[in-house]
Amino acid sequence: MKVKKTYGFRKSKISKTLCGAVLGTVAAVSVAGQKVFADETTTTSDVDTKVVGTQTGNPATNLPEAQGSASKEAEQSQNQAGETNGSIPVEVPKTDLDQAAKDAKSAGVNVVQDADVNKGTVKTAEEAVQKETEIKEDYTKQAEDIKKTTDQYKSDVAAHEAEVAKIKAKNQATKEQYEKDMAAHKAEVERINAANAASKTAYEAKLAQYQADLAAVQKTNAANQAAYQKALAAYQAELKRVQEANAAAKAAYDTAVAANNAKNTEIAAANEEIRKRNATAKAEYETKLAQYQAELKRVQEANAANEADYQAKLTAYQTELARVQKANADAKAAYEAAVAANNAKNAALTAENTAIKQRNENAKATYEAALKQYEADLAAVKKANAANEADYQAKLTAYQTELARVQKANADAKAAYEAAVAANNAANAALTAENTAIKKRNADAKADYEAKLAKYQADLAKYQKDLADYPVKLKAYEDEQASIKAALAELEKHKNEDGNLTEPSAQNLVYDLEPNANLSLTTDGKFLKASAVDDAFSKSTSKAKYDQKILQLDDLDITNLEQSNDVASSMELYGNFGDKAGWSTTVSNNSQVKWGSVLLERGQSATATYTNLQNSYYNGKKISKIVYKYTVDPKSKFQGQKVWLGIFTDPTLGVFASAYTGQVEKNTSIFIKNEFTFYDEDGKPINFDNALLSVASLNRENNSIEMAKDYTGKFVKISGSSIGEKNGMIYATDTLNFRQGQGGARWTMYTRASEPGSGWDSSDAPNSWYGAGAIRMSGPNNSVTLGAISSTLVVPADPTMAIETGKKPNIWYSLNGKIRAVNVPKVTKEKPTPPVKPTAPTKPTYETEKPLKPAPVAPNYEKEPTPPTRTPDQAEPNKPTPPTYETEKPLEPAPVEPSYEAEPTPPTRTPDQAEPNKPTPPTYETEKPLEPAPVEPSYEAEPTPPTPTPDQPEPNKPVEPTYEVIPTPPTDPVYQDLPTPPSVPTVHFHYFKLAVQPQVNKEIRNNNDINIDRTLVAKQSVVKFQLKTADLPAGRDETTSFVLVDPLPSGYQFNPEATKAASPGFDVTYDNATNTVTFKATAATLATFNADLTKSVATIYPTVVGQVLNDGATYKNNFTLTVNDAYGIKSNVVRVTTPGKPNDPDNPNNNYIKPTKVNKNENGVVIDGKTVLAGSTNYYELTWDLDQYKNDRSSADTIQKGFYYVDDYPEEALELRQDLVKITDANGNEVTGVSVDNYTNLEAAPQEIRDVLSKAGIRPKGAFQIFRADNPREFYDTYVKTGIDLKIVSPMVVKKQMGQTGGSYENQAYQIDFGNGYASNIIINNVPKINPKKDVTLTLDPADTNNVDGQTIPLNTVFNYRLIGGIIPADHSEELFEYNFYDDYDQTGDHYTGQYKVFAKVDITFKDGSIIKSGAELTQYTTAEVDTAKGAITIKFKEAFLRSVSIDSAFQAESYIQMKRIAVGTFENTYINTVNGVTYSSNTVKTTTPEDPTDPTDPQDPSSPRTSTVINYKPQSTAYQPSSVQETLPNTGVTNNAYMPLLGIIGLVTSFSLLGLKAKKD
């Protein structure tokens, strides 16, 4: 915190009201239609004023008025929010349809126009586009259908006409062809008859010759056949002999071949081994050969490279050698030529130098004559030039003056131009930024569209799949429903039989087992460590089972879970897993179970969320999540304070709840309320419809009853079960069910070998229904309370049914869907929903970027004046140029003989590498030849069979000719009938009706264009209402009027100029009477809307600009749009609140803005209104009230108004201790970024501070300190927006002079937030006047008021100075720690006897309640210090005694100091009373002592020296004990006038007195 002090003049005044606030008189502000802004609504006055305008409950110093009532127009408009009246008709172009109908009529088609089809009224342009697209598609389809029908009909007519013409032509051709065919037929019949007669004659002659030739051939052939048969018999005999001889020869040959094959097999095997060895040798050779060839190649390549390098170097060498030799020859030739030329040139130079010498002598004589004439001419020219220069300088001065003026004018114009350029650049930068934003919005719109399109395509694919699956799923569902219906009909017949639901129902909640569920917990109690739970199981009541590796939950003593180090920061799981794997539990025997543990008090809760559910369904639809809230019933009667909940990870296992502390309890109970909600796959709460929830294992013994109560839904009894319902509680209502035969129990709950039906209390027991029932539940949120209670708290005590013995206050219960009734059908199939085809997303309309503003025109700069022209100086005469004497030319040096280049060194050839040795080819083994094959024998050739003589062929029998058949005459022609004309078709068409109700949306924003609907903004904030209208649809009628009417809320100050500036395109009017603003679209705007009626058009919107001017106000607003006087709609209602409104539903932190001021003492005790001693420190505690601003959305300009805290303290009474000022936040953290300045008065403050205070209506009376946020934005973000109050502790010391005068002072503070001021309460304290008094008395009686001040005291008289201390009033602010009497008496005339006494002047009450009465002696609670040399005595109260006095008690004491008058004269005396470090002087007493010659005692010589003797006197050595005050002190004043010995040390005092007397005498 930075501290700064500023000093000024302030007129001092001390009175009963030393401080306060001078509040500016707050001008009345109209709540509607006012033409001034909030910054202008306060005035100040020079007179003190009080805080006004607390109508809102907020102590505002400016704009204090409460918000007025809403106008009738505003209320009516808001009550009708969202209502519409009329619509905008949309006409979809139907040109194509009309043309198709017209063409159809022209073509002769029967055209019928049907009634118009109403497509309804849509809300948005997008919906209109969709509908218009549907209509367009329908019109297109109608037109296409009509055109198709028309074209078909026209085609049919044309085809019919063509077909008629075709048939007629064809029939004519048929007729002509028939006549032609008949003539040809007749000619052909005549030809055929003649030809057939000639063929028959020729055939009959050939047949006679054939028969004679056939008889001769048959005879020859019979003789040839007989000869052949004879030859054949001889052939067959010879063939047999040859075949037998050949068979014998072949057998001998086959034997020889077999022997030869065997021998050759052996040879082949040997040859195979030879081949292998040869192959190995060959491979090795080829490897070496390859290596040789590679190395040979490398060597050859290297040698070739070396040779190539050598040849290249040789070529270069030869080239360079030729060049060097030529260069050297050229250089030598040039040198020799140069030598000859040099000799010739030097001879010429020698002759020329002789001529030069003569010319130089002639030039010198001529120059000296010209120089003399020049000097005379030069003097005349200089005189004329001096006159010209003076004239030029005068003109130059005038020129420079004008030039400066022109340059400044041009610079100013340039600066203005550059400022305009900068403004233009800034504006264009803003437009560029806006265009960038537009690009981003367009890109976002495109990305959003593409994302929606991708989703649509995915949804479409899913839809198509779902559409294919739907019939299958529907069939499965309907089959199951039919099966369930049949089962329920059967169960209805048996509902009164054991184990059946009395109200048969299907179980649509499948919720039996979830071993893999995930559990997460939250709690307002405490999480327990798993190690703490394990430790608790290992102790006391549960130890025995623990040692057997059994976790017996109902034996666990929960006091072992109540240590501070048992608490975990989050859920930890425990159970028979991990290092407890293999252990058993009483919950599920050897099956693994896990649970999280919490420790709760009555009324506390734990909320469990179960996920990863795999087996649970409702109506066939998967359950994804269950949320249970477990709350300890505050009415539970268990004796302890804590309940341990073991919440199982499997929600179907439920909860183990225990308040068992190791001892059974009588008349006890423990109940847990279970609130639960089930969620479907989409994360939505499931709305149960008669879902069955099992309540099972409800045991009843004669000392304990387990029950369910306070449940939603309806109880369903199971026939034969012991569980019923009574008085809203579900339990075994009529009998016990613990052991057979006891209290009417039918079976024993646990298994007994000798008892059939025992063990019903197991989930898999066939008669588990005996201890169970069901609850039929509906709705998304349900609850049931379960627990256990002593029987005597439910039914009267009874030896059988209810005995008063102790029980453990614990219970394990589970809520699941496992209904114990028999044959309950389950719903496993979800009723499939017909898939809905997704709608394709609408392609976005992209915003158009705004053009940049043109650059400003560069100014026309003034032309700078023409500088004066200097009169040219007369040319000085040309001074004759000294002659340039010719220099004799030196002779040319002899040419240098050239250095010839050395010839290059010839290159050296790199020697070739030696080629590698080529490997020797291997010597291969020779394979052995095979044995030659035996020679096959020569077999005898078989004899040649005889060849029969071929038969002579028989002659060919002549073929009887085929006579031509007489052709069939042509058929009579068949003529084609003409086709039937096509029937005339009928086409129908219809038009559509479509209307649009464009939607409107009202938005409320701050000056940073941030949405502030249903939020909080500071008073005086600029609030903008944006009146937005959706796109006007395509196909609309021309828009002739577009009017928006907005009845503004009360307390909202309308700014017409800003509104007009923010609403281009609209004419703005304002009705002050109704506080209503009306926007009418201009002609230009309407022209834009009507530019293309075939396309939708984006509307522009007006913006209402104004300020909110009330504390604790709610500003609600909507508007009405009217288009063409045919369509009207009321917008949504927006709402914004200002701070200072308690019970604000939109802003729960909102409350009154009330800075507070409290005065405390050093111990932190509030001392408002108490008496405060001078010199004490006031610890003023100022609260900067910021919590109501939490979640504020004020704009940056409002925030920049700053945050201030003003402390108007009374500088007349208090001294500021700015070095001790401390600022902390509500969390105790030190606040940084706040500076504090101190000003002696308002006039001493800078103008900035004066303006802030003036606008806030605050005028401090005098000095004040002001705290301000250095960086308003950081302060706002850190403390204001987060709603964190600040505490300022500002210590101030009560000035000492206040104790001299007394009086009251008051103190007030103010906070200024966003320019709005609020006053704190006023603190008033009173400073008592401390007025010590001094008397001179002759007695020690406090009741003796005889004062001899101003009188005569005889010499050697013993008397008393009575020192009456100042009174400390009752109810003072801080403890007394110092109350002293200091008396500087005149030791020349008075001698202190060493005796004093102290008495109470008022009743004194101590902190322990004891009282010392007025008049009681207090000497024992004091000490005295005496300096006899200086004549000073100090009597001090012990600090412990003073601090034991109650601050509610008054305090005053008086001291009596005994003196003896030892000198003659007049003596004056004053004493000082010190109270808590502040000294107060008493009145001065004066006494006179005359000479007394009869007095035998020599008076002390005033001039004699005195020895300084300091006495520290402590009348009592014991510390003050308030409790013994009544026992040791009298309750009344002391009336004895004699001085009593002071606590046994009078001898010591006397000794000091004697020493003092002795010193005087010495």
Curated annotation (Swiss-Prot):
<comment type="similarity">
    <text>Belongs to the antigen I/II family.</text>
</comment>
<dbReference type="InterPro" id="IPR019931">
    <property type="entry name" value="LPXTG_anchor"/>
</dbReference>
<feature type="modified residue" description="Pentaglycyl murein peptidoglycan amidated threonine">
    <location>
        <position position="1532"/>
    </location>
</feature>
<feature type="propeptide" description="Removed by sortase">
    <location>
        <begin position="1533"/>
        <end position="1562"/>
    </location>
</feature>
<feature type="region of interest" description="Disordered">
    <location>
        <begin position="42"/>
        <end position="91"/>
    </location>
</feature>
<dbReference type="InterPro" id="IPR041324">
    <property type="entry name" value="AgI/II_N"/>
</dbReference>
<dbReference type="GO" id="GO:0043328">
    <property type="term" value="P:protein transport to vacuole involved in ubiquitin-dependent protein catabolic process via the multivesicular body sorting pathway"/>
</dbReference>
<feature type="compositionally biased region" description="Low complexity">
    <location>
        <begin position="1500"/>
        <end position="1509"/>
    </location>
</feature>
<dbReference type="Pfam" id="PF00746">
    <property type="entry name" value="Gram_pos_anchor"/>
</dbReference>
<dbReference type="InterPro" id="IPR009578">
    <property type="entry name" value="Surface_Ag_I_II_A_rpt"/>
</dbReference>
<keyword id="KW-0964">Secreted</keyword>
<dbReference type="InterPro" id="IPR026345">
    <property type="entry name" value="Adh_isopep-form_adh_dom"/>
</dbReference>
<feature type="repeat" description="Ag I/II A 4">
    <location>
        <begin position="386"/>
        <end position="467"/>
    </location>
</feature>
<dbReference type="Pfam" id="PF18652">
    <property type="entry name" value="Adhesin_P1_N"/>
</dbReference>
<feature type="signal peptide">
    <location>
        <begin position="1"/>
        <end position="38"/>
    </location>
</feature>
<keyword id="KW-0134">Cell wall</keyword>
<keyword id="KW-0732">Signal</keyword>
<keyword id="KW-0677">Repeat</keyword>
<dbReference type="InterPro" id="IPR032300">
    <property type="entry name" value="Antigen_C"/>
</dbReference>
<feature type="region of interest" description="Disordered">
    <location>
        <begin position="1482"/>
        <end position="1509"/>
    </location>
</feature>
<protein>
    <recommendedName>
        <fullName>Cell surface antigen I/II</fullName>
    </recommendedName>
</protein>
<dbReference type="Pfam" id="PF17998">
    <property type="entry name" value="AgI_II_C2"/>
</dbReference>
<keyword id="KW-0572">Peptidoglycan-anchor</keyword>
<keyword id="KW-0214">Dental caries</keyword>
<comment type="function">
    <text>Surface protein antigen implicated in dental caries.</text>
</comment>
<feature type="short sequence motif" description="LPXTG sorting signal">
    <location>
        <begin position="1529"/>
        <end position="1533"/>
    </location>
</feature>
<feature type="compositionally biased region" description="Pro residues">
    <location>
        <begin position="943"/>
        <end position="958"/>
    </location>
</feature>
<feature type="repeat" description="Ag I/II A 1">
    <location>
        <begin position="147"/>
        <end position="221"/>
    </location>
</feature>
<feature type="region of interest" description="Disordered">
    <location>
        <begin position="824"/>
        <end position="973"/>
    </location>
</feature>
<feature type="compositionally biased region" description="Low complexity">
    <location>
        <begin position="42"/>
        <end position="54"/>
    </location>
</feature>
<dbReference type="InterPro" id="IPR013574">
    <property type="entry name" value="Glucan-bd_C/Surface_Ag-I/II_V"/>
</dbReference>
<dbReference type="Pfam" id="PF06696">
    <property type="entry name" value="Strep_SA_rep"/>
</dbReference>
<dbReference type="InterPro" id="IPR021197">
    <property type="entry name" value="Cross-wall-target_lipo_motif"/>
</dbReference>
<feature type="compositionally biased region" description="Polar residues">
    <location>
        <begin position="76"/>
        <end position="87"/>
    </location>
</feature>
<dbReference type="GO" id="GO:0005576">
    <property type="term" value="C:extracellular region"/>
</dbReference>
<feature type="repeat" description="Ag I/II A 3">
    <location>
        <begin position="304"/>
        <end position="385"/>
    </location>
</feature>
<dbReference type="InterPro" id="IPR036234">
    <property type="entry name" value="SA_I/II_PAC_V_sf"/>
</dbReference>
<feature type="region of interest" description="Helical">
    <location>
        <begin position="60"/>
        <end position="551"/>
    </location>
</feature>
<dbReference type="Pfam" id="PF08363">
    <property type="entry name" value="GbpC"/>
</dbReference>
<dbReference type="Pfam" id="PF16364">
    <property type="entry name" value="Antigen_C"/>
</dbReference>
<feature type="repeat" description="Ag I/II A 2">
    <location>
        <begin position="222"/>
        <end position="303"/>
    </location>
</feature>
